[in-house]
């Protein structure tokens, strides 16, 4: 049995875990639970992050933030190599027709940012689950969902998201910048056409005046 010093992690389920490259740091995020570990006395939605240091055999709570969102997290989370951010799939498990949303968590303070579009998932049975993976060779995130219904049917789906994932605001901002750039290109093109047409008309008018000019006759003394 391993003995860890430091902060206590209360009993919970529906929590997520991320591991660093050398497997010395384990991050545990969120879930549902309570101090006693007895579901009969109720459960709380947890919004906290713990760091388990296997080398130091210690547990440290990095933060615990209040949240208005009642969300649980998929078991597998993705930790960035610099251990500054964690990517996690969160969803309201109490909804039968629920949805998964990818979030980026800041390890230092717990700031959450929604990324990409949501993924629909039917969560009728407790065995229904979702998982998140990252392929460093293709730079893609993979989400798999396994759905069970009351008739015993199973449906497995896979979704792919190219890295780096961006937020909806960033997509809108990029679209606005692209539209502005296109608008300026059309304006500059219009100015260029006007200058070209004006130059051609000026040259033609000048040549016409030169042709119509009558030379004065010189007087002979």
Where are these regions (language model features)?
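Conserved short beta-strand element of beta-propeller blades
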Residues: 4-29, 42-44, 49, 70-87, ...
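Loop/turn-rich, solvent-exposed surfaces of beta-rich toroidal or solenoidal domains
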Residues: 66-109, 187-193
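Short, conserved, GDST-rich strand-edge loop motifs in beta-rich repeat architectures
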Residues: 28-45, 89-99, 147-155
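Beta-propeller blade signature
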Residues: 41-57, 99-111, 154-175
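C-terminal single-pass membrane-anchor helix
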Residues: 172-221
């Amino acid at each position: 049995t391993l003995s860890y010093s430091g902060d206590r992690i209360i009993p919970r389920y529906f929590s997520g875990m991320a591991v660093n490259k050398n497997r010395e740091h384990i991050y545990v995020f969120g879930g549902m639970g309570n101090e006693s570990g007895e579901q009969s006395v109720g459960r709380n939605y947890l919004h906290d992050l713990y760091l388990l240091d296997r080398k130091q055999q210690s547990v440290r709570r990095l933060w615990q933030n209040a949240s208005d969102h009642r969300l649980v997290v998929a078991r597998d989370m993705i930790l960035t190599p610099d251990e500054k951010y964690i990517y996690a799939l969160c969803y309201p498990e109490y909804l039968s027709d629920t949805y998964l949303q990818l979030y980026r968590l800041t390890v230092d303070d717990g700031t959450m940012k929604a990324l990409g579009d949501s993924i629909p998932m039917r969560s009728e049975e407790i065995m229904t689950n979702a998982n998140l993976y990252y392929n460093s060779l293709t730079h893609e995130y993979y989400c798999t969902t396994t759905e069970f219904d009351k008739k015993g049917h199973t449906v497995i789906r896979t979704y792919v998201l190219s890295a780096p994932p961006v937020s909806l605001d960033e997509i809108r901002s990029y679209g606005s910048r692209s539209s502005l750039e296109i608008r300026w290109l059309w304006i500059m093109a219009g100015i260029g056409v006007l200058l070209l047409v004006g130059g051609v008309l000026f040259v033609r008018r000048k040549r016409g005046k030169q042709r119509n000019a009558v030379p004065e006759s010189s007087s002979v003394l």
